[in-house]
Amino acid sequence: MAGYALPSTFRSITPPCEENLYRSIHAQLEAFAEPPSPPVITLQNLDDPCASATFGEIMYSTYPRFGAQGLITSCLRRNLQHVEGLGFLAFTNGALAAHGYCHIILMNVPVTVDGIIIYPSDLSHGDWNGVTTIPHQIASEVPQVCHEIAEAETIILNYLKQPTVTATGFNAARQECGEALSQLGRRLRVEYVPATRVGRGP
């Protein structure tokens, strides 16, 4: 999963101030059409602990239909047996069999999800290993860098395939790998400047 963060804050433990629970979802879907795209839905749950499941079959079907690439959230989900085959990647904090008063508080604002600060328009990536953000300045280099990291790690892996190994030999291979990775890090290090996008309410 890769796309541009559309981060929002969220609650479900109490009803919203307005009667229409779906107004904020309407605004969210409209924002999908704004650049940059495609969007990654990013929600910080302000309820502690989580009071209800935020996402089930309906939302898992709605978001990709409007162009979203995935979901990153500290909220919970439900309908696991139904959403598994939908192909929409979602990174959540678990599951809960409960409905709630789901509504967005603020949209397009910086959020924190499981220790990751995510700004509006951050390039977000997720796979089986988890979620991260990628600075725009180095995004075009990521495919090549992944290859170089894997190549550096083969120094250790190749040593371990030798008929005889020693702690001294392993340490030498580890140091060689570490130096290769350090050189790569020095080459890529940039000052991270969040993409600017004005925050707004739903």
Predicted segments with their positions:
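Feature captures the catalytic cores and cofactor-binding loops of soluble hydro-lyases/lyases
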Residues: 1-120, 134-202
